[in-house]
Amino acid sequence: MEIYLVRHTETVCEKGICYGQSDVGLAEPFELIFENIISQLPSEAIIFSSPLQRCVILAKYIQNKIKTISYQEDERLMEMNFGDWEMKNWNDIPPEQLNPWMEDFVNICAFNGESFVELHKRTGTFLSEQISKKTDKPIVIITHAGIIRSFLCHHTSLPLKDAFQNKADFGQVIKIDF
């Protein structure tokens, strides 16, 4: 099964802002980048998207261009929940909270947030469901950097602590086979 992992394009957030599950918009103009993304995708596919607008805008654009009947939003494709850190500048997060997370982001979470291992479990559930369907159509997943890194860890058996070795740039398309 072919899976295309697509990271949303740049957001309106200033650099240095923690915006995991906050529903922030996309920086404009984005149409040229969207066209570049589409050029890397199959002409027919099943499309899934995070329900956050920075992914949904791209999903709708792709749906219209490649004439896919529909796309499906799935909350398991949302970025990591950073809890009380959402929409704060990383530099404004107290070191006594941030440092332990930086040392072990896999198991430690922001207050009222989730850990990477929790995120990884939900991506694993999503992935298992798709694999069990045994579809012959490619799957396009429009999502976020944390989710892409998690999928790549599932795909390569890379330890979660090394997830940041997986590159996930804005607007990047990564094709994997399961």
Predicted segment positions?
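Phosphate-handling substructures
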Residues: 65-122
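Domain-level recognition of soluble alpha/beta enzyme cores
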Residues: 158-178
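Glycine-rich phosphate-binding loop signature in dinucleotide/nucleotide-binding domains
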Residues: 40-43, 130-138
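Short beta-strand scaffold positions
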Residues: 49-50, 121, 142-143
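Active-site-proximal alpha-helix that buttresses catalytic centers in soluble enzyme cores
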Residues: 3-69
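GST superfamily/GST-like fold recognition
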Residues: 145-149, 172-174
